[in-house]
C-alpha cells in the first residue's frame, strides 16, 4: 500500500531541474467576468513559488498546462487561458509565450529547444476531448474519446518536457490525461501539491491526539463516506450545519419544524451512531438553534433549545449560544483539527455566528499549537470571508480532492507521482 501513502511522494525540491524543460500541470481554472477579466488571481498566485524555484535553479524552460471551465472537448474562445498571460508576466517579471494549442506538431516544435529561461503557457487542455476522456460534440451530444487518440494526446504532452511537476491538487481526484498520462521518468509534486499532501498526511497518517473533525453542510448522504472514514481516525466529531437536524429527528426524535431533513437517511444516521460508539468516538450535536420563519436575512428570528424544539413553519439556520460554548470546549482540547462544512447559513449575517465562532476557536487552537486543516469548498470560503487563511495551519485549495482524500479514496493524480 505504501505507494499510495500520500506522505512519501517525490517533490520538486528533490529534483535537479538545471538545464531541463519542466512541464507543470497547474490549476489556472480562474473565475472570469463577462469581459474575460480575471476576478481572482488566487490560483495563479499560489503557483508562483513553484515556477520561481524552477527558474532560480536553472530550468531551461517551463511549460504550463491547465484547464479552465468546462468546454467539454470543444474549442470555446470564452474559456481561453490567454487572460492569464498578463497576470503571469506581472508576477514573474518576464515575457510569457502563449501557444494557441496544447498538443500537436507546432506545439512540440515550440517546446523542443526553447531559449534558456523561457516560460510557455499552453492553451486550455479541455479544448481536446482527450484530456477528460469524454465531452460533447458540436450538436451537444455526449461522446467518448477514441482510446488511440487519447494515447496520442498523452504522448504529445509528454514530449513537451523532461521533468513533470503536478501542482494542481484541485484536480488530483480526476484521472485526466494531464494528471495521470505524462510518461516522464520523474513525476514530482510542486510546492502547492506538496503542502496539501504534507498536511493531509499529518492528519490521516500520523495525527497528534486528540483528533477532532468538524463536519457541517446540508446532507448526511453527501458526507456519509467522509463521516464513516473519519470515525476510524478521530477521537471526537462535531456534526453541525443542516445535516444535524436529520440526526436530531431520527436519534432523539426532536421537533425540527421545517428544517433541512433527509427522510431516507434513517438507517445511515443509526449506523453512524453505532459505529461511533464502537470506535469510542465522542459525537457532538447542536443543543440549541437560531431559527427563522423563512430562509431570509430579514426573517423573524429567535433562539430555541433542542428540548423546546423547532415549531412547524420555522427552520434552524444556525447553532445557538450554548452549542457555540460546547463547541469551543471541544475545539480547545484538540491537537489535530480537520474542518469540512459550515455550522450554519454563514452567507447571511443573521446566521453566521456559529461558523464565525468555530473559526475563531480554530484560530485560537492553532495559536496554541494544534494542527488545523480547513477542507476546500465552503469552509475555504469562510476562511477567506473571515480573513483567517494565514491564521490556521492549512486551507486546502481543492474542494473535491480534499473531500475524497478525507473519505479515504485514492487520488489518481497523487498515485501517478513518483514514489520517494
Curated annotation (Swiss-Prot):
Primary residence: cytoplasm
Enzyme class (EC, first level): transferase
Calmodulin binding: annotated segments: 209-228
Domain of life the protein comes from: Eukaryota
GO terms of biological process kind: gluconeogenesis; glycolytic process
CC cofactor: Mg(2+)
Positions bearing Phosphotyrosine: 199
Residues engaged in binding ATP: 218, 223, 242, 316, 347, 378-379
Keyword annotations of the record: ATP-binding, Calmodulin-binding, Cytoplasm, Glycolysis, Kinase, Magnesium, Metal-binding, Nucleotide-binding, Phosphoprotein, Transferase
Residues the record lists as binding (2R)-3-phosphoglycerate: 26-29, 42-43, 66-67, 69-70, 125-126, 173-174
InterPro entries xref list: Phosphoglycerate_kinase, Phosphoglycerate_kinase_CS, Phosphoglycerate_kinase_N, Phosphoglycerate_kinase_sf
Record family assignment: Belongs to the phosphoglycerate kinase family.
Name recorded for this polypeptide: Phosphoglycerate kinase
Amino acid at each position: 500500500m505504501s505507494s499510495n501513502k500520500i506522505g512519501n511522494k517525490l517533490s520538486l525540491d528533490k529534483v535537479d531541474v538545471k538545464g531541463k524543460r519542466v512541464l507543470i500541470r497547474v490549476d489556472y481554472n480562474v473565475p472570469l467576468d463577462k469581459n474575460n477579466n480575471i476576478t481572482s488571481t488566487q490560483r495563479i498566485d499560489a503557483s508562483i513559488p513553484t515556477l520561481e524555484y524552477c527558474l532560480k535553479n536553472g530550468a531551461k524552460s517551463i511549460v504550463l498546462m491547465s484547464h479552465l471551465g468546462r468546454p467539454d472537448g470543444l474549442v470555446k474562445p470564452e474559456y481561453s487561458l490567454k487572460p492569464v498571460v498578463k497576470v503571469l508576466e506581472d508576477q514573474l517579471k518576464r515575457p510569457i509565450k502563449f501557444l494557441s494549442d496544447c498538443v500537436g506538431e507546432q506545439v512540440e516544435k515550440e517546446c523542443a529547444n526553447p531559449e534558456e529561461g523561457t516560460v510557455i503557457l499552453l492553451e486550455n487542455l479541455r479544448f481536446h476531448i482527450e484530456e477528460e476522456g469524454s465531452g460533447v460534440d458540436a450538436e451537444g451530444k455526449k461522446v467518448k474519446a477514441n482510446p488511440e487518440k487519447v494515447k496520442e494526446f498523452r504522448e504529445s504532452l509528454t514530449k513537451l518536457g523532461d521533468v513533470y511537476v503536478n501542482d494542481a491538487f484541485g484536480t488530483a481526484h480526476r484521472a485526466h490525461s494531464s494528471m495521470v498520462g505524462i510518461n516522464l521518468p520523474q513525476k514530482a509534486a510542486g510546492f502547492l501539491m506538496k503542502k496539501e499532501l504534507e498536511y493531509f498526511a499529518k492528519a490521516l497518517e500520523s495525527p497528534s491526539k486528540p483528533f477532532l473533525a468538524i463536519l457541517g453542510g446540508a446532507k448526511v448522504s453527501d458526507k456519509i463516506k467522509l463521516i464513516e472514514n473519519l470515525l476510524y481516525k478521530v477521537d471526537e466529531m462535531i456534526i453541525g450545519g443542516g445535516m444535524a437536524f436529520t440526526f436530531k429527528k431520527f436519534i432523539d426524535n426532536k421537533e425540527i419544524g421545517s428544517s433541512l431533513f433527509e427522510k431516507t437517511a434513517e438507517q445511515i444516521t443509526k449506523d453512524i451512531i453505532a459505529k461511533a460508539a464502537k470506535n469510542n468516538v465522542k459525537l457532538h450535536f447542536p443543543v440549541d438553534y437560531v431559527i427563522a420563519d423563512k430562509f431570509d436575512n430579514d426573517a423573524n428570528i429567535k433562539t430555541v433549545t433542542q428540548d423546546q424544539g423547532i415549531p412547524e413553519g420555522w427552520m434552524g439556520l444556525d447553532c445557538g449560544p450554548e452549542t457555540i460554548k460546547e463547541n469551543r470546549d471541544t475545539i480547545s482540547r484538540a491537537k489535530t483539527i480537520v474542518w469540512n462544512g459550515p455550522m450554519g447559513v454563514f452567507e447571511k449575517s443573521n446566521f453566521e455566528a456559529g461558523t464565525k465562532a468555530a473559526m475563531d476557536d480554530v484560530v485560537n487552537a492553532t495559536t496554541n499549537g494544534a494542527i488545523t486543516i480547513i477542507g476546500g469548498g465552503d469552509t475555504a470560503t469562510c476562511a477567506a470571508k473571515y480573513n483567517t487563511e494565514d491564521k490556521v495551519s492549512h486551507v486546502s485549495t481543492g474542494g473535491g480532492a480534499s473531500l475524497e482524500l478525507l473519505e479515504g479514496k485514492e487520488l489518481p493524480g497523487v498515485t501517478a507521482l513518483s514514489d520517494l
